[in-house]
């Protein structure tokens, strides 16, 4: 079964963007390639219980098991040895990607306290968008009583757009709530 956001993208967003940017071929229209959710563990890397809890939370939020990222080299100042767990990463593609983006836009972001909209300055120059979240409680899948510590996450939305203007138009057409109607 196709996701609601994917169906909306194919039926409404593609024709709109094709007309807006004068694309001759439908394959020129920007699309979302993948979404990467990353969480740095910080002091939780010392404690296996916190690592497992964080991995379980990210798995619940993303709907897919995450990969534990490990340090490449030892850094004495941070008390990190080589191959020590330092973060968790989940890469979403296909149906799960659209399901997560739909939940992010329609459920999680509106639950942020004093939410004013997303910044347009987080584009990387190639149409990809990154955002950071301070806490995991905005996702309805997370039980407030089950969490041990507030931890944020970084979310990167990688698109096939070649410039920020196209990436902004794609995300705005999909319903991403931005502060301003134009890109800076």
UniProtKB/Swiss-Prot annotation:
Disulfides per UniProt:
none
Question: How would you summarize the oligomeric state and partners of this protein?
Answer: Part of the 50S ribosomal subunit; contacts the 5S rRNA.
Task: List the GO biological process terms.
Answer: translation
Upper lineage is:
Eukaryota, Viridiplantae, Chlorophyta, Nephroselmidophyceae, Nephroselmidales
This one is known as Large ribosomal subunit protein uL5c
Which key words are in the record?
Chloroplast, Plastid, Ribonucleoprotein, Ribosomal protein, RNA-binding, rRNA-binding
| UniProt cross-references to HAMAP family, sorted A to Z | Ribosomal_uL5_B (MF_01333_B)
Keyword Mitochondrion attributed: no
Q: Cross-referenced Pfam families, in alphabetical order?
A: Ribosomal_L5 (PF00281), Ribosomal_L5_C (PF00673)
For molecular function, the Gene Ontology terms on record are:
rRNA binding; structural constituent of ribosome
Protein encoded by which gene: rpl5
Instruction: Tell me the InterPro entries matching this sequence.
Output: Ribosomal_uL5 (IPR002132), Ribosomal_uL5_bac-type (IPR020930), Ribosomal_uL5_C (IPR031309), Ribosomal_uL5_CS (IPR020929), Ribosomal_uL5_dom_sf (IPR022803), Ribosomal_uL5_N (IPR031310)
What is one term from the GO cellular component aspect held by the record? chloroplast
Which domain of life, per UniProt? Eukaryota
- Purpose: Binds 5S rRNA, forms part of the central protuberance of the 50S subunit.
Cell compartment(s), UniProt: Plastid, Chloroplast
